[in-house]
């Protein structure tokens, strides 16, 4: 990997942040202000070196035409965890959960630090569509036995049936609320939490 100076690292990070936030790169003046360089020619010099090292591409005919490149050698290897897909769970009426591991999915470790804390379930039904969870989606679930009001959870009823709903603890009962305005909530006296939905994976056919 080609080395860059601390100032060039700062410039590259600022360009990435601006593109991420605004959708377009900053001007030379904005770069200079961000990293403490008063001279535009000095900024141009750093940009030229970043371009020579393969980190950016510029179009000299346009004032903001800076394209961020990600050369293979500059990409830090991402830590991956393998999360088990343990079957299907309803997003409609509760059904008995299928808990056989079908396959493992590689996911970035931003979802968790220990593989045994996460699992995935395939959604059946349309009761969570207004939360963006569709029939056939795979939800990423962090194992936990408690939930806060409003969390989307995998809930197990007293009949050992599983469902994905938004959780609410209310006086004398629990409300498992669908995210579909045409469906009624499920009211139960007892419920156990299998985990909280923390992410979503969707196959595109």
From Swiss-Prot:
Gene3D superfamilies membership: Umud Fragment, subunit A, Winged helix-like DNA-binding domain superfamily/Winged helix DNA-binding domain
A Pfam family recorded for this sequence: LexA_DNA_bind
Annotated keywords: Autocatalytic cleavage, DNA damage, DNA repair, DNA replication, DNA-binding, Hydrolase, Repressor, SOS response, Transcription, Transcription regulation
Keyword hit for Repressor: yes
Catalyzed reactions per annotation: Hydrolysis of Ala-|-Gly bond in repressor LexA
Transcription regulation recorded as keyword: yes
EC number(s) per entry: 3.4.21.88
Active site per database record: 127, 165
Top-level class of the enzyme under EC nomenclature: hydrolase
DNA-binding residue intervals: 28-48
Site (Cleavage): 91-92
A GO MF term: DNA binding
Any Gene Ontology biological process: SOS response
InterPro entries: ArsR-like_HTH (IPR011991), LexA (IPR006200), LexA-like (IPR039418), LexA/Signal_pep-like_sf (IPR036286), LexA_DNA-bd_dom (IPR006199), LexA_repressor (IPR050077), Peptidase_S24_LexA (IPR006197), Peptidase_S24_S26A/B/C (IPR015927)
Quaternary data: Homodimer.
Family: Belongs to the peptidase S24 family.
Function statement: Represses a number of genes involved in the response to DNA damage (SOS response), including recA and lexA. In the presence of single-stranded DNA, RecA interacts with LexA causing an autocatalytic cleavage which disrupts the DNA-binding part of LexA, leading to derepression of the SOS regulon and eventually DNA repair.
Protein name: LexA repressor
Source species of the chain: Lysinibacillus sphaericus (strain C3-41)
